[in-house]
Regions:
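Short helix-loop junctions at transmembrane helix boundaries
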Residues: 305-339, 402-417, 758-796, 802, ...
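Interfacial "coupling" helices/loops that link adjacent transmembrane helices in transporter permeases
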Residues: 5, 9, 13-16, 253-298, ...
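Juxtamembrane segments of multi-pass membrane proteins
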Residues: 423, 435-593, 602
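Membrane transport/envelope proteins' first extracytoplasmic loop
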Residues: 2-254, 263-266, 288, 503-504, ...
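Alpha-helical transmembrane segments
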Residues: 4-7, 11-12, 16-17, 21, ...
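Alpha-helical transmembrane segments, especially those used as permease/efflux helices
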Residues: 15-19, 237-240, 253, 339-356, ...
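C-terminal membrane-exit region of the final transmembrane helix in multipass inner-membrane proteins
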Residues: 339-377, 790-816
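Short conserved beta-strand and strand-loop elements enriched in small hydrophobics
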Residues: 149-163, 599-615
Length: 816
């Protein structure tokens, strides 16, 4: 019977349910979109093989570090593809070796990666000669695209420039800008073998039996493309970032959906009261409300999943276009997409039903004699579950914040930790919103309008809370996360400036090149009257230091950012507390104090290609949030090219310094590099990092804030639409339409003020804890807030709320 009543109610009052249906559909679409993109990133994307599209079997070294413990075998993806061991190459004589290394025609435009290969591997793509002949001597090359046969050119390599002659061309393909050498010259330029290719199944089986190798066939051959490991690193980072963004978006969607459904039940209190009066039992009333919520939940969730299917590819395209993922990243719908959609669908229905459970139970327990009184004035009490849940979230958030600030300050810059703290505090404030609103709106209690505002809040705490929740979420998340990001970013940039603080100039590679050649570095060191240090950005795999508060991963090594230096000169400025950087060598390392290592201790680490090393600690550094906590000799950077050379002029005469600068510029110009003042370089790096952070924040907060804005409009419209009788009484009492609209606008602004005040308190806690943590970890760091953006978000929230509140009143209060 109550199912029939529920269906009839939906059919006859569909307009009243439109707001909740819209909020639910859009909320589920946000969850579906994020989960679909997250699933695609976690799956590694879908890419066809390029470099080895015509190779039957591709043999590579295992690109993962494997460890065995009582729980089984765990793997960690390596940061660089290791070479095929020489012993394996010797045991597979029938396979053809492929080498991929940096080789770029001087003056070639930046674009796809410039890579050199031996000519015998050209057929694996396949590349076929379109003119000329294959390289026959070490000074001959074949290039892709149009070129003048017989033309002498310069090829830039990691070892330095080479004078060669173009003797042939091949048709270009996507994925790289190839330069083909003789096999012997390729082996000289890059001794390591990146992959072996064979068409013999027996050879492939022997390779599989050797251990430590993987044999790739079919679509899996894309894992052997030269940029596959880097793509995997980018996708792993994207997966982590999307996980945070998905958690924030899901939190916002669930909170707004729950608020909208709770408001819809509160506004139908009169209907439910009448049902109790005519004899409906408490169980029947509660069942009817749950059934309505389930029906709306199913319809809204289905629509939301459909919208998610439409929006997920667009979001993936946006992510790829902003360089947050490989350029080829996309969402393709496969059987693996079903779980992501199922999660969104079930979440939507579950939230819809759960949102009305308390209201349905309260409506069902109302005695018939109290029903009509309950219909007029909402009860002011807050349910025990909501009270304890809100207090629990606040206690957990404050406790976590205190632990980070006082015990584990090095975790302050971690995005997962910051997001967890913010969500706990904002979630606690959302649950306690009905309790917080009245004291926060007391400043508006004067005058007739103020009396009406406070009376509206006091008699309708549920309605007021529903209006406050989206604003609280929008402003609270925006201020806390934007402020935390900008403050931590400023601390990281300060650490980077300190690293090159003693340098006068910085030598940088030309745009589109992966780094500086060792030949150029050697020429810079040969210039008199200057000190120089070549810095290489790299990573090392290591176990997390001692105890970490909020990372409970399995005891497997994880990547840590590091720099490799070729020498410790006066140009390198690192805050050494103990020991000396002069002792850095092939078997030593410098670490910051967050590693809790003592001078002379031996650390077990893994190089980016998985090579295990034991390095002795020769220097302890003061902690910095620049992201670099390890410093090694350049020999342990796995052949990566230096990203910069820090240069400091000697203390001699001005004429000698000028001569040194002129020589530096001339040497750099010959290699296509740039020389910039250190101050200008640090500013440029800061601008670049700010731009990258901005793109990340757009993804992290953009969807959530956009949905929150829709939630503000939806709940404000629903709230005003449910007050037609109250507004009509005001008109009968003599209020004009303009006065009614003004009162509604003032009430909306008062609620916005309450939400902003609560958000300010939350943000103050978050940023205060962050400031303490940064001060303990890296010294004094000022709090940085994007005031203009925060003002725009708060102002837009207020404007949306005001407009959505007065529009229904203007059309329903009669003529003025």
């Amino acid at each position: 019977m109550m199912l029939t009543v529920a269906v009839a109610t939906l059919r006859t009052r569909w307009v009243a349910f439109a707001g909740t249906l819209a909020a639910l559909a859009l909320g589920v679409s946000v969850i579906a979109t994020m989960t679909l993109v997250l699933a695609a990133a976690d799956d590694g994307g879908h890419r066809s093989p390029e470099r080895f599209a015509a190779a039957p079997f591709v043999i590579q070294a295992d690109p993962a570090l494997r460890a065995h413990d009582a729980g089984g075998t765990d793997t960690v993806p390596l940061l660089e593809q290791p070479d095929v061991p020489a012993s394996a190459v010797a045991q597979l004589p029938g396979a053809t070796a492929d080498r991929s290394f940096y080789a770029q025609l001087d003056g070639a435009p930046a674009g796809q990666p410039p890579l050199g290969h031996g000519w015998s591997s050209a057929a694996f793509a396949p590349y076929r000669l379109s003119s000329g002949h294959p390289p026959r001597t070490d000074g001959e090359i074949v290039v892709a695209g149009p070129a003048v046969i017989g033309r002498p050119v310069t090829v830039l390599t990691a070892g330095g420039p080479l004078a060669v002659t173009i003797v042939g061309t091949v048709q270009p393909r996507t994925g790289e800008q190839p330069v083909f050498f003789t096999d012997a010259e390729a082996a000289r330029l890059s001794p390591g073998v990146d992959a072996l290719v064979t068409d013999d199944p027996a050879t492939a089986r022997r390779a599989q039996a050797l251990g430590g190798l993987q044999v790739l066939t079919g679509a899996a051959r894309h894992q052997a493309d030269p940029d596959a490991v880097q793509d995997g690193v980018e996708l792993a980072g994207l997966t982590t970032f999307l996980g945070i963004a998905a958690a924030i978006s899901a939190f916002v969607a669930i909170a707004v959906i729950a608020s909208a459904f709770g408001l819809s039940v509160a506004q139908r209190r009169r209907d439910l009261a009448l049902l109790r009066t005519v004899g409906a039992t408490p169980r029947q009333v509660a069942r009817m409300v749950r059934t309505e919520a389930a029906l709306v939940g199913v319809a809204g969730s289905a629509l939301g999943c459909l919208l998610g299917v439409l929006w997920a590819p667009l979001l993936a395209r946006w992510i790829a276009g902003r360089s947050l993922s490989p350029a080829w990243f996309s969402v393709q719908f496969t059987a693996g997409s079903a779980p992501a959609l199922a999660v969104a669908f079930v979440a939507g229905v579950a939230v819809a039903v759960a949102s009305v459970l308390v209201a349905a139970r309260r409506a069902g327990l109302t005695r018939p004699t109290e029903a009509l009184r309950e219909a007029v004035v909402e009860p002011a009490r807050i349910s025990p579950g909501r009270l304890f849940g809100g207090l629990g979230c606040l206690v957990a958030g404050i406790g976590t914040l205190a632990a980070v600030a006082l015990l584990f300050p090095s975790a302050a810059g971690d995005a997962k930790t910051e997001a967890t703290i913010v969500l706990l505090l904002v979630g606690g404030a959302v649950l306690l919103a009905p309790f917080l609103i009245e004291p926060l709106t007391r400043p508006f209690g004067r005058g007739t309008a103020g009396m009406l505002i406070r009376a509206g809040v006091r008699t309708g705490p549920g309605r007021a809370a529903a209006a406050v929740v989206p604003v609280l979420i929008t402003v609270g998340l925006a201020v806390s996360i934007l402020g935390s990001s900008d403050t931590a970013g400023a601390a990281a940039q300060a650490g980077l400036r300190q690293q090159a603080g003693a340098a006068d100039y910085v030598v940088l590679p030309a745009s589109g090149t992966p780094g500086l050649t060792m030949a150029l570095v050697g020429r810079i060191h040969a210039i008199a009257d200057l000190d120089a240090t070549a810095v290489t950005q790299t990573s090392l795999l290591a176990h997390e230091p001692a105890i970490t508060a909020f990372h409970l991963e399995a005891p497997m090594p994880i990547p840590f950012a590091a720099i490799g230096v070729d020498r410790a000169s006066a140009a390198l400025s690192l805050p050494v507390r103990q020991g000396s950087l002069a002792d850095l060598g092939d078997h030593t390392i410098a670490v910051d104090s967050s590693w809790h290592e003592r001078l002379g201790a031996t650390m077990s680490l893994w190089l980016p290609d998985g090579t295990p090393v034991s390095l002795r600690v020769v220097a302890i550094l003061a902690p910095s949030l620049s992201g670099v906590s390890l410093v090694v000799d350049a020999a342990n950077a796995c052949g990566a090219m230096p990203s910069a050379v820090y240069v400091r002029l000697g203390g001699g005469a001005a004429s000698a310094a000028d001569a040194a600068v002129d020589s530096l510029r001339a040497v750099a110009r010959q290699a296509g590099a740039r020389v910039v003042p250190a101050s200008r370089w640090s500013a440029a790096v800061s601008d670049q990092q700010n731009e990258q952070n901005q793109v990340g924040l757009e993804l992290l907060l953009g969807i959530a804030i956009a949905y929150s804005a829709i939630g503000i409009a939806s709940t404000s419209l629903m709230s005003t639409s449910g007050r037609k009788a109250e507004l009509a009484l005001l008109r009968l009492a003599g209020a004009t339409r303009r006065q009614v609209a003004w009162i509604l606008a003032a009430e909306s602004l008062a609620l916005t003020f309450a939400a902003v005040a609560a958000s300010a308190a939350i943000s103050g806690l978050v940023l205060g804890g962050l400031w303490v943590a940064l001060a303990r970890a890296a010294g004094f760091t000022p709090i940085v807030l994007p005031w203009l953006l925060i003002g725009v978000i708060a102002g837009a929230s207020a404007l949306i709320g005001v407009v959505a509140s007065i529009l229904p009143a203007l059309g329903s209060t009669g003529p003025s």
